[in-house]
């Protein structure tokens, strides 16, 4: 058989030829001309993901990759060496890009402002450089989360107060999952799309377009080690799924991995508040708002148990929030346990 006799379906060729860069440009056709910088921003995010993925693939072979730095971050959490590396990668990739004016990370107390001697853009990148970094030392999946917002006002006082806005202000959001393959999932507000990094090409190639989360799914993902620290409503919900067939518990300790599973298979991710931390653990600007943006674009639902996550307005950059994210029916079910419990308390 000659090469000319080999039949390759056009659909396969189209998908194989659709890089992240090409796809983003297609998505931006419906945007104004002033939004074209978003394509370059996405390319830079992809570059950061490639650099982090390469580092992770050699984590057990290189020095200064595994373990802790001995420092704590703004949340009082011990900082892993990969946290520092990944955060520095994002800064290095964007510092002289001329695309952003600030980078806000959960690893930094205040945003990083692009120096005046560098070209300065009008967008802000908010990100969690490495989510689930405790998994790095044992070779389990981790991820990066990102969101893009446009600067509003001049921010002359360096307070970044314009970032204290609801999640609907996000122009784009996504995550990169570092697992058996490296997957980038993003949305510009018109569907959710996933790309797999082809190591031989060094390109993110379209894997799935217009992802739709099932309306109901079998997965419930939560750390049941906190069971006795939750409100009674959440304990009642957990007892409910224990008693009913068709539910499966899956929890990896990496938010991106758990959300990706639910996006693909359906179900619900829960990180409620506890007696010790009533506002939960997850950061609104860097974690839950970007993921809520994605899940809603895929037809899902995201709330703090009472309010839509994208409606929440933070009062500080590192504000935390409880999170219930996933299939619409499953999130509504959890919310119903919470509302019923409040009604009983009211009576």
UniProtKB/Swiss-Prot annotation:
One of its GO terms (biological process) is reductive pentose-phosphate cycle. The keyword Magnesium applies. Mg(2+) 2 binds at residues 128, 131, 287. Mg(2+) 1 binds at residues 106, 128, 130. InterPro entries: FBPase_C_dom (IPR044015), FBPase_class-1 (IPR000146), FBPase_N (IPR033391), FBPtase (IPR028343), Fructose_bisphosphatase_AS (IPR020548). It is found in: Cytoplasm. Its EC number is 3.1.3.11. GO terms for cellular component: cytoplasm; cytosol. Pathway: Carbohydrate biosynthesis; Calvin cycle. It comes from the Bacteria. Keywords: Calvin cycle, Carbohydrate metabolism, Cytoplasm, Hydrolase, Magnesium, Metal-binding. Its cofactor is Mg(2+). Substrate binds at residues 131-134, 223, 251, 281. Belongs to the FBPase class 1 family. This is Fructose-1,6-bisphosphatase class 1. It comes from Synechocystis sp. (strain ATCC 27184 / PCC 6803 / Kazusa).
């Amino acid at each position: 058989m000659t090469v000319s006799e080999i039949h390759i379906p056009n659909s396969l060729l189209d998908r194989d030829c659709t890089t992240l860069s090409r796809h983003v440009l297609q998505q931006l056709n419906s945007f104004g001309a002033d939004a074209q910088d978003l394509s370059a921003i996405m390319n830079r995010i992809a570059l950061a993901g490639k650099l982090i993925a390469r580092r992770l693939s050699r984590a057990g072979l290189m020095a200064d990759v595994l373990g802790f730095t001995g420092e704590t971050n703004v949340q009082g959490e011990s900082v892993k060496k990969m946290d520092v590396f990944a955060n520095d990668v994002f800064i290095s990739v964007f510092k002289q890009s001329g695309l952003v004016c600030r980078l806000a990370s959960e690893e930094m107390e205040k945003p990083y402002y692009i120096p005046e001697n560098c070209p300065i853009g009008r967008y802000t990148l908010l990100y969690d450089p490495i989510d689930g970094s405790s998994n790095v030392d044992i070779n389990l999946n981790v991820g990066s989360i990102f969101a893009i917002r446009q600067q509003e006002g001049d921010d002359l006082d360096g307070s970044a107060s314009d970032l204290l806005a609801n999640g609907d202000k996000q122009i784009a959001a996504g995550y990169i999952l570092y697992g058996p393959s490296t997957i980038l999932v993003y949305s510009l507000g018109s569907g959710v799309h996933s790309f797999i990094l082809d190591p031989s090409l060094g390109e993110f190639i379209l894997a799935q377009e217009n992802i739709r989360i099932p309306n109901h799914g079998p997965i419930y993902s939560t750390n049941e080690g906190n069971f006795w620290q939750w409100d009674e409503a959440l304990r009642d919900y957990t007892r409910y799924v224990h008693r009913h067939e068709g539910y499966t518990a899956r929890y990896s300790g990496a938010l991106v991995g758990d959300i990706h599973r639910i996006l693909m298979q359906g179900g619900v991710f829960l990180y409620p508040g506890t007696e010790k931390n009533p506002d939960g653990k997850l950061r609104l600007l860097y974690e839950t708002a970007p993921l809520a943006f994605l899940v809603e674009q895929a037809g899902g639902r995201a709330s703090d148990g009472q309010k839509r996550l994208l409606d929440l307005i933070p009062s500080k950059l590192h504000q935390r929030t409880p999170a219930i994210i996933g299939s619409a029916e499953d999130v509504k079910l959890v919310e119903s346990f919470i509302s019923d419990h409040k009604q009983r308390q009211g009576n």
